[in-house]
Amino acid sequence: MLGGKKTGGMNVYVRDLSRALEAVGVAVDVFTRSQDDCAPRVVHDLGPLARVMHIPAGPERPMAVGDTEPYLGEFVANVLDFAEREGVRYDILHSHYWLSGLAAEALAAGWGGTPIVHMFHTLGAMKNQIARDASERAPQSRLEGERRVARIADRLVAPTPAEEVQLVELYGADARKIVVVPPGVDLAHFNPIHQLQAKQMIGIPPNRKNILFAGRIEPLKGIDTLLEAIALLKERQVTDLSDTCVTIIGGNPWAETLDEELERLQRMRLDLGLDDLVAFAGARDQQILPYYYAAAEMVVMPSHYESFGMVALEAMAMGTPVIASEVGGLAYVVRDGYNGFLVPRRNAEALALRIADLLGDHRLRQQLSANAMNYARDYSWARIAQQILGVYQAVAAPSPVLS
């Protein structure tokens, strides 16, 4: 599911990288905390050489990421037991997110110094720079954990040169250990579909223009800026919105108890008089997501911070232009005026103008669409996996078995 409470780009990254590595003969074991005691402990759905292991650690139910830290020791012990029972030896530990980096450190010690490759995906120090209040700030334990992982990892994978600089300046990371490798996109899955076919598939009238947001419902995604921009367009009548809808993919708008941010955004929609324009569609399965991208005239990513922004690549692969905040990885993925537009973050005025530009100019949308598809081809997972494999080979023996 995209836009679910505990899902996002990192899960997609791990899944697709594992499949791409498996496709070139690398054996991959993915260890994750079990969230369901009825689920199989070992799942073989990433390919013949790839497995997903659900490891008990704490209550076997979904938990907020921050609440899993006390169970890190139990997780490590159970992974060590599993590997010993299976008689498996790993040549590389590739950890994702800071807690997994700490787990990798303990596992490496248990296995006699297995090299660690780490990718943070998001940085607590960067989130804190744009946090509006204490509730949005990363805790001190995370910042200290990230500094430790930056120090002990043999290689750090940064998705952009911007994060490479942030790792050095904010965490004191050794620049010689950092390699820049962007995420990829599944070009077979995100393969262009005719827009009319896509609209029919998801129930959007053929003559209706669609503005799409896809992602988790959380403050740093800047969805409130999108709502403010649409309200400006409606108020000023800069462009005709009578044939336009805004679809927000993410969260669960039908839950008995709404997520705090989702509740705030729904109130905001009503206060701004946008209930006839904006629809909260909830999280959507990855299988149907390409149709939403293809049905949209544009994808809007008004984020306050993005380490990379895989949604932008997925949209471009479908031929959909992206309007994004000029922050983090989005500033590298979106080429202003080529495959989309960049706007200052938290600037509803600038965002409204760019939305109006795309809504009102079919020829411009076509040009950006063609450019976006060409651009996305450079990010195939086959190509990215080769770059990651090069990182592994630099720190370990040939023919690695990965965890």
Predicted segments with their positions:
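A conserved catalytic-core segment of Leloir-type glycosyltransferases
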Residues: 7, 12, 20-90
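A short helix/loop element that forms part of the nucleotide-sugar donor recognition site in Leloir-type
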Residues: 191-204
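Nucleotide-activated donor-binding/catalytic signature segment of Leloir-type glycosyltransferases, i.e.
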Residues: 259-284
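Short alpha-helical donor nucleotide-sugar binding micro-motif in glycosyltransferases
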Residues: 283, 291-296
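Aromatic "clamp/platform" in nucleotide-sugar-dependent glycosyltransferases that forms part
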Residues: 304
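Conserved acidic donor-binding segment of nucleotide-sugar-dependent glycosyltransferases
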Residues: 336-337, 341-348, 357-362
